[in-house]
UniProtKB/Swiss-Prot annotation:
HAMAP family: UPF0434. It holds the Pfam family Trm112p. InterPro entries: Trm112-like. This is UPF0434 protein NGR_c31900. Belongs to the UPF0434 family.
Length: 62
């Protein structure tokens, strides 16, 4: 995967929130995901586009 394709614009990251909790998201560059600590969900980034659907999110395990 091209490293540039998985980057998230910092300005976009400031605007995006978890659709479930409306809380802030943390960008995990290694996993190419946006993480909602509150909801314990990780939203994938595909071709540089954050997929902000709860049904597409990965549940974060302890």
């Amino acid at each position: 995967m091209d490293a540039n394709a998985s980057r998230v614009d910092p300005k976009l990251l400031e605007l995006l929130v978890c659709p479930l909790t409306k809380g802030r998201l943390r960008y995990d560059a290694e996993a190419h995901e946006l993480v909602s600590e509150k909801a314990r969900l990780a939203y994938p980034i595909r071709d540089g586009v954050p997929i902000m659907l709860v049904s597409e999110a990965r549940k974060i395990e302890d």
